[in-house]
C-alpha cells in the first residue's frame, strides 16, 4: 500500500526547519499542497527570518505546490487568515500538523512566569488557534486529519522544562478530546511525541549521534497519522526509526472500607499494583471503573 496525499491540502506550522520542514517536504512529495507556516524565530521565539519561503522554494524546485505563511500561531486572527487563504486557493484544508514551538528551559525555581506563559502560549494555545481555524472547514468537508506534537517531557517529565512539559501534556489531552468530538465529522486527531535532533534539541545529543535522530526519520510516523487510514486518539513516539505507542493506564485500585489518609497510606502498594491495569478510552470510562468497584466487580 502506497500512502498518497494527492488532492489534499495540508498546513504545517513551524515548518521552516527541523521536523516541520521534513513533514512539509514529504507531504508535498506525496502530492499534497502545503502551507508552510513559520515565524522564522529562534528557538526561544525571538527574531524573524524567511525560513518558510526557503522551504516553499525547496518544494517548488522538486515539482511540488506550496505557499509560505509567516503568521504567529499565537495570533488567532492570523491563523484564521492563513486557513482561509489556503481554502480560497486550493478548495479546502484536509490536514493540520501543529508543530510550532519554542523553548525557554530553566528549573522552576529560576523560571520567570513570563517564560512559563510564553511556552504555553506557543505550544498549547497556538495549537488551539490553528485547530480552531480549520475545524469548521473540516466539519463541512466531513474529513480532517490533525496532528498535535507532544513530547516525552510532556508524557513523563524532564528536569528544567516545567513550562514545556505542561504545554506538551496539555496537547495530548486536547488531542484525545478532539478525537472524540471529531469522530462523527470524519475528523481524526492524533499526537506524536518525536525524538529528533533539531535546532530546539540539538544540544541534547552527542555530536556523533545527531545523524541517527534526523527529523526525516520521524516524518513516516507523522504522515501515517494524518493519512486516510490513520487511527484516532493515538499517542505515538517516533525517533531514529523506532515507533512506539504510549498509553495512559489505570490500575484496578482498592476499595477502602474506611476512606482515611491512613488507609490510603496502608494500601498504597496495592493501589499502585499494575497487575490487571486498563487503558480507559474516555474520562467517562474512567469514572465508570469507580462505579464498577462499588458494585464489587
Write out the residue ranges for each language-model feature.
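Residue(s) in the substrate-gating loop at a strand-loop-helix junction
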Residues: 151
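Canonical Rossmann dinucleotide-binding motif of NAD(H)/NADP(H)-dependent dehydrogenases/reductases
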Residues: 3-36
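Active-site helix of classical SDR
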Residues: 131, 167
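A glycine-rich helix->loop->beta "capping" turn
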Residues: 4-6, 62-65, 85-98, 104-107, ...
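Substrate-binding pocket helix/loop in short-chain dehydrogenase/reductase
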Residues: 59, 107-108, 115-120
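The beta1-alpha1 cofactor-binding region of Rossmann-like NAD(H)/NADP(H)-dependent oxidoreductases
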Residues: 49, 53, 70-81, 113
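C-terminal helical subdomain
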Residues: 191, 209-296
Amino acid at each position: 500500500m502506497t500512502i498518497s496525499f494527492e488532492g489534499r491540502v495540508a498546513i504545517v506550522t513551524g515548518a521552516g526547519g527541523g521536523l516541520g520542514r521534513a513533514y512539509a517536504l514529504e507531504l508535498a512529495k506525496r502530492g499534497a499542497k502545503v502551507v508552510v507556516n513559520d515565524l522564522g524565530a529562534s528557538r526561544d521565539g525571538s527574531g524573524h527570518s524567511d525560513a518558510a519561503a526557503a522551504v516553499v522554494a525547496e518544494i517548488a524546485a522538486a515539482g511540488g505546490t506550496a505557499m509560505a505563511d509567516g503568521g504567529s500561531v499565537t495570533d488567532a486572527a492570523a491563523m484564521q487568515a492563513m486557513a482561509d487563504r489556503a481554502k480560497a486557493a486550493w478548495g479546502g484544508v484536509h490536514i493540520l500538523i501543529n508543530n510550532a514551538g519554542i523553548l525557554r528551559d530553566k528549573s522552576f525555581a529560576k523560571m520567570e512566569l513570563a517564560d512559563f506563559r510564553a511556552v504555553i502560549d506557543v505550544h498549547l494555545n497556538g495549537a488551539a488557534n490553528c485547530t480552531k481555524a480549520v475545524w469548521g472547514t473540516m466539519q463541512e468537508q466531513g474529513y480532517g486529519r490533525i496532528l498535535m506534537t507532544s513530547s516525552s517531557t510532556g508524557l513523563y517529565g524532564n528536569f528544567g522544562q516545567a513550562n514545556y512539559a505542561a504545554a506538551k501534556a496539555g496537547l495530548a489531552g486536547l488531542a484525545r478530546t478532539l478525537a472524540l468530538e471529531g469522530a462523527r465529522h470524519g475528523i481524526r486527531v492524533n499526537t506524536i511525541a518525536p525524538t529528533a535532533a533539531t535546532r530546539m534539541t540539538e544540544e541534547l545529543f552527542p555530536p556523533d549521534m545527531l545523524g541517527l535522530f534526523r527529523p526525516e526519520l520521524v516524518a513516516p510516523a507523522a504522515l501515517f497519522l494524518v493519512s486516510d487510514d490513520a487511527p484516532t486518539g493515538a499517542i505515538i513516539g517516533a525517533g531514529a526509526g523506532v515507533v512506539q505507542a504510549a498509553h495512559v493506564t489505570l490500575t484496578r485500585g482498592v476499595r477502602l472500607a474506611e476512606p482515611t489518609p491512613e488507609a490510603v497510606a496502608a494500601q498504597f502498594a496495592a493501589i499502585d499494583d499494575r497487575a490487571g491495569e486498563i487503558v480507559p478510552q474516555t474520562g467517562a470510562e474512567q469514572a465508570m471503573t469507580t462505579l464498577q468497584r462499588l458494585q464489587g466487580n
